A protein has these predicted regions:
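N-terminal glycine-rich phosphate-binding loop and ensuing alpha1 helix
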Residues: 1-60, 65, 84, 122-124, ...
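Residue-level signal for pocket-adjacent positions within structured domains
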Residues: 4-7, 111, 138, 149, ...
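Well-ordered alpha-helical segments embedded in enzymatic catalytic cores
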Residues: 17-21, 92-96, 173
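Short loop/turn motifs at secondary-structure junctions
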Residues: 29-31, 104, 132, 170
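Conserved beta-loop-beta/alpha segment of the NTase-like Rossmann-fold superfamily
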Residues: 44, 54-57, 64-160
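Catalytic-core segments of class I nucleotidyltransferases/pyrophosphorylases
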Residues: 109, 127-131, 159-181
Length: 181
């Protein structure tokens, strides 16, 4: 972790996590990205700003690839900030983002830049499942019994569906970070 750079801006190889999220959302057809930020972390939104002076300087020095990298985030998606005044958890953050939705928007994806799912393309598959079946779609993976205390654990039943190569299960219940028994 870091004390000076928000974790959302930490690079995964050479691209900040928040930019990877924006890229995947845009690739799935999203028009806007509501970024939930704490009052002291609004600088995260600067990443989606325009830096024409820096780009021009890089181009003048023959660094076109770097200039393109600087411009990339600004052209991916419209990013809007939503402030979460108190850190009251992920559910509260999602509720805060509701204010950014337009009346005709009925689908929301919760994407966390510090919890990347690889390979890229999982969101495309989730969109395909929602388009086919409707409702809420969650991405889950198996963990060893010894690791369950780190995760929310689902009780599932077979939905007898496979969409876009993905096994679809129906969630019956969930326990957040259970003790190993």
């Amino acid at each position: 972790a870091t004390k000076t750079v928000p974790k959302e801006l930490l690079p995964v190889v050479d691209t900040p996590g928040i930019e990877l999220i924006a890229e995947e959302a845009a690739a799935c057809g999203a028009q806007r990205l509501a970024v939930v930020v704490a009052p002291n972390k609004e600088e995260i939104m600067r990443h989606f700003g325009e830096f024409s002076d820096l780009q021009e300087l890089m181009v003048s020095r023959g660094k076109q690839a770097q200039a393109d990298k600087v411009a990339r985030a600004n052209g991916l998606i419209e990013a809007v900030a939503v402030t979460q005044d108190e850190p009251l958890g992920l559910g509260h953050a999602v509720g805060c983002a509701e204010e950014a939705l337009d009346d005709d928007e009925d689908a929301v994806a919760v994407m966390l830049p510090d919890d990347l799912v690889l390979p890229v393309g999982v969101m495309d598959k989730m969109v395909a499942v929602r388009n086919e079946l409707g409702g809420s779609v969650l991405c889950a993976f198996n963990v060893s019994r010894e690791e369950v205390f780190n995760y929310g654990v689902f009780d599932v039943e077979d939905a007898q569906a496979e969409i876009d190569g993905v096994e679809v299960l129906k969630v019956r219940g969930m326990v957040e970070k259970p003790a190993v028994e």
